[in-house]
């Protein structure tokens, strides 16, 4: 296998990026940094099993941070000719000089720069066989996922049929090179292969339900064996015949596919800029316990081969694994170089690179046998005992369960942040959603691998066809367990994995949230209101889907009511947030 990629940044492009820094200095800049970003995406889309469209997009740009006379500006161009660049940078410097001076703007200290991101493949997110996959093979990967022909016709064996199916295969190569007048030289190269299926099913009464699933990998192995078409159908069918749940306070379990939605407002509130502007509900939280002792969040960008892994910040500083929240205590805010200088505090990360929420089960759920606890992570500067964990690791390997396997690039192109890692849509494919949170459902405890070979126990009724060929009638005994086998509680959740099914069993009864349907959180107060959908569960088992409901409350209060956090975040997502459970959440019809 060759160790080069056809569309990756070339030596000539690196040379022009380095030269452009000197051009900026020659034009009168006191300092300059440039990010060279390059991305290519190929998309093969099927509609109802037939080719709908084939698209290819490519992007290449230079983004400059220009400093001159104590002033600062950002400029971008896709012109790489030296004469054009020289003229562009002269005008850029002239423009910067028109701005108001800001003494806090400047490049990072040289001692803080990353020095080990040399070739771009250090984090193991690049597959050098990328160019060897043929057009026919890519199209076949899309066709293999389609199940429209199998389930589009009415059948006496089921009370539904697939009326629409959209399958999309895409592969993306993204490459970033960062260089500056202070000697920064950093590179990150990533490849991704992905296939997704979105289906709409119609029941016998004409009601329609939508389900979506996806599979992803740095190389195509996982895509080649993907069953996401069938899983998407499962997601849709499980929503048939929803009931109206009574309003009130419920134990809320949140699927790992959408749980990141609840942590994001907390991470946003930890921005030093938001704190400085008093637009954060965590203004005075640093160093204080403001959340449940069970909440432990780390930023872990140095986990090689994992989604979101990277060696350098967007300003060229070396990344570090960091404690963000430990035992409910806010340990760090996200502080850029600029805010560091403005506020006179040490810099940290400008934003979370790869947030990881650690496993936890409360004393309330364990019945006092073990007491609440969470699992520490060893290595990379962290000691499990230092995080207060009373266990070596959820899988007994001292690592707190590895929390994710696959690695990640988003749907595609770099979006000006110098990364190209899960930052939105691939070169105009219009998605702009992070994988895993695009799902309208997200059921099944171990859906990353064995997501419900049976449809599960929803209403105990007629829906009945099982993709895993299990009995063909009663819908199985549990939605989250695969093949309908009864699984008792594990004797010690700190030795084994903690999946959604375990948390449902521990919680007993409540509402499982599998999707957020709009809503927002007030960044200044933490008050939130979200539309949600999902399932009622009783005695640890799913009973029926529910119509959309509204949850309301306050983020600080919500995270103080944390009952459990699983060890099951979705591989391939940069935010490693597992299944979550909260007590006494207010639901309204």
Regions found by a protein language model. Give the residues of each.
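N-terminal small-residue-enriched
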Residues: 1-404, 408-412, 416-424, 428-435, ...
